[in-house]
């Protein structure tokens, strides 16, 4: 299965040279890390970090996403990136794993790690092989050019969550852990999520603050509780909960929020904004 770009030319440039320039601008922007890191080498099986990244158009969230990709480059790349995003289309299964083929971007093709994907599915009560959830979903696609900017020497396991429950998060985290151990492969989990949607800047800063505090405290239960209590429209809380749970299973018990902004900080329109944050679990 070849997964063609769904949002190239909209969320990011569809021309490879323009895309590279856009990514570099994200790193060098005052909201970004302020530098373009060199990619280091990584050896071994226990990759030291997992990350959280936003998934809006690069003009809005690319500078914030660059903070997490700066950390990944500094640690070197593992063999596999497991990229978990929410389901914006409503298609597919509870936990949809794109288990065979390649993903195409303007920077080249990326192979799916079919062995890791199928092994993950075999250990899960929720996950199944499914392409439908992925074909128009942007939350995973927009991460790939940032990775390809540094290297094409990696594979991916794309996972879309239709079910964002604690049960599904625990199940998926355990399945990833077991698959990694069985295959003896190094991997990093990328949780793709924006924060609150279409609030005023003042309210976004307030409710996103609740979310970010819960993430820093590595408390998936409080995160879900406050999302419900305050009606926080965070689209990818399931991927974030999964990554927090898995990180703790692997002994990565601390997290750090690297950057936070809203779309209003970029556009100047503070009446209706979306929140974006990058974070690292280590």
From Swiss-Prot:
A Pfam family: Memo
Family, per entry: Belongs to the MEMO1 family.
Coiled coil: none
Top-level lineage group: Archaea
Protein name, per record: MEMO1 family protein Msm_1438
Species name: Methanobrevibacter smithii (strain ATCC 35061 / DSM 861 / OCM 144 / PS)
């Amino acid at each position: 299965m070849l997964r063609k770009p769904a949002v190239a030319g909209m969320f990011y440039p569809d021309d490879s040279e323009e895309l590279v320039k856009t990514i570099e601008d994200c790193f060098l922007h005052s909201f970004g890390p302020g530098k373009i890191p060199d990619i280091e080498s990584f050896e071994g099986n226990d990759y030291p970090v997992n990350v959280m990244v936003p998934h809006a158009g690069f003009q809005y969230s690319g500078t914030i996403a660059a903070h997490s990709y700066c950390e990944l480059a500094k640690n070197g790349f593992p063999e596999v990136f497991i990229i978990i995003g929410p389901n914006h289309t409503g298609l597919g299964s509870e936990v949809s794993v794109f288990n065979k083929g390649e993903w195409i971007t303007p920077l080249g093709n990326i192979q799916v790690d079919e062995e890791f994907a199928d092994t993950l599915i075999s250990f899960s009560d929720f996950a199944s092989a499914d392409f439908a959830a992925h074909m128009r979903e942007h939350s995973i696609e927009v991460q790939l050019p940032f990775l390809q900017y540094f290297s094409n020497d990696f594979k991916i396991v794309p996972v879309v969550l239709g079910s964002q429950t604690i049960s599904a998060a625990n199940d998926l985290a355990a399945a990833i852990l077991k698959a990694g151990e069985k295959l003896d492969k190094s991997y990093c989990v990328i949780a793709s999520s924006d924060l609150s949607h279409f609030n005023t800047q003042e309210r976004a800063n307030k409710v996103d603050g609740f979310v970010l505090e819960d993430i820093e405290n590595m408390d998936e239960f409080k995160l879900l509780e406050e999302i419900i209590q305050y009606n926080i429209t965070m689209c990818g809380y399931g991927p974030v909960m999964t990554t927090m749970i898995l990180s703790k299973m692997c002994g990565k018990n601390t997290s750090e929020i690297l950057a936070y902004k809203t779309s209003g900080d970029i556009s100047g329109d503070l009446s209706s904004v979306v929140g974006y944050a990058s974070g690292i679990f280590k």
